[in-house]
Amino acid sequence: MIQKIFDEKYNFITMFNPETGSYVRTGILNQHGWDSGIDPFQASFPHLIDVGIMGHCIHGKTGLCLKAGIGCYQSGLTVYEPNMSVEDFQSIAEQCKGRVNQFALGGRGDPDQHAQIDQILMICWENN
């Protein structure tokens, strides 16, 4: 199902197909609802939200990334913080419902290593 968002503040439409990843955006719509050809400079809300659900990195702590020659911009070797709670993620997702096309899950480590990744993915699906 194609997701369609009308930006009332800046008067344009975005459409996203979650199955194919196709994304299109109109220009600013004129008083007749036609594309004016003028590119909207910004949206009233981001269409992609990058949420740092990971507070630490299993691979970084073991030094595996360093041994492979991979530098970590998140200080995975030295920093250990708790991962984001499902409740906090749900709160973010609910605030974004109907306003965002995609959630990018990240943080300090592999998001698929989050203990509640199944719940987080379900929350993404429910709030797309």
Which ranges hold each PLM region?
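N-terminal [4Fe-4S]-dependent radical SAM core
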Residues: 1-57, 61
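A general secondary-structure boundary signal
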Residues: 12-15, 86, 123
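Core AdoMet radical
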Residues: 48-52, 73-84, 99-114, 124-128
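A general structural detector for well-ordered alpha-helical segments in enzyme core domains, enriched
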Residues: 88-92, 116-120
